[in-house]
Amino acid sequence: MPKMKTKSSAKKRLKVLGNGGVKRSMAFKRHILTKKTTKTKRQLRGTVMVHETNMASVRAMMPYA
């Protein structure tokens, strides 16, 4: 049986941590930023953890992580 492939999109966007959690970047921060307030842009900085309701699909996309 051949190996399962990791989805390239998940590989580029997600980082698996040592405790089993998955880290992701915030969306809506790439373009059309002039109409967004400074507060909104500040709150979109940094990374957050993937929610537990999405972890099953993330694990399916990254079988060896």
Curated annotation (Swiss-Prot):
<protein>
    <recommendedName>
        <fullName>Large ribosomal subunit protein bL35</fullName>
    </recommendedName>
</protein>
<dbReference type="InterPro" id="IPR021137">
    <property type="entry name" value="Ribosomal_bL35-like"/>
</dbReference>
<keyword id="KW-0687">Ribonucleoprotein</keyword>
<dbReference type="Pfam" id="PF01632">
    <property type="entry name" value="Ribosomal_L35p"/>
</dbReference>
<comment type="similarity">
    <text>Belongs to the bacterial ribosomal protein bL35 family.</text>
</comment>
<dbReference type="GO" id="GO:0003735">
    <property type="term" value="F:structural constituent of ribosome"/>
</dbReference>
<dbReference type="GO" id="GO:0006412">
    <property type="term" value="P:translation"/>
</dbReference>
<dbReference type="InterPro" id="IPR037229">
    <property type="entry name" value="Ribosomal_bL35_sf"/>
</dbReference>
<dbReference type="GO" id="GO:0022625">
    <property type="term" value="C:cytosolic large ribosomal subunit"/>
</dbReference>
<dbReference type="InterPro" id="IPR001706">
    <property type="entry name" value="Ribosomal_bL35"/>
</dbReference>
<keyword id="KW-0689">Ribosomal protein</keyword>
